[in-house]
Regions:
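N-terminal glycine-/charge-rich "phosphate-binding" loop or analogous flexible N-terminal tail
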Residues: 2-88
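Phosphate/diphosphate ligand-binding glycine-rich loop within oxidoreductases
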Residues: 87-138
Length: 138
């Protein structure tokens, strides 16, 4: 079972987000509504440190809509990214390319990109053939 972070840290996050959150490994994974397995799972497999707070501030928008699992580190290792996203219904992509080999190994139906130039990060034709929605976060 996942460990909760220190009470003070968790209380701050709960007050700020007004939602239940669970930290599986305080330094690496942040997850909202982990008990709501009836909801789709949105995974942020990697993130740039300066963006963490901005994402956390908006997690409340997902309350009762989707669970969010954010890994609080950055890697370009494809196997790590795939392992983190294997259960994902949707993936928020920040700073890594979704090579065809990633698309081939995952079943997510939506890839939301946190930047511009989406066509440089994913094969749009392959995504369309697979029925994958590709969009921007905002």
């Amino acid at each position: 079972m996942a460990q909760y972070a220190s009470y003070r840290w968790l209380k701050t996050r709960k007050n700020r987000l007004n939602t239940q959150c669970e930290v599986k490994d305080m330094d690496e994974i942040y997850e909202t509504q982990p008990e709501r397995t009836d909801l789709p799972l949105v995974v942020i497999p990697v993130i740039i440190e300066s963006m963490i707070e901005s994402f956390e501030k908006n997690f409340e928008l997902f309350k009762d809509i989707a669970r969010v699992r954010m890994y609080k580190d950055f890697t370009l290792d494809e196997d790590t990214i795939v392992a983190r996203c294997v259960e994902a219904d949707a993936i928020i992509v920040i700073g890594f390319h979704c090579a065809d080999s990633i698309l081939d190994r995952l079943n997510a139906k939506c890839y939301a990109f946190g930047g511009t130039g989406v066509a440089s990060y994913i094969d749009l034709n392959k995504a369309k053939e697979r029925g994958i929605r590709v969009c921007n976060v905002v």
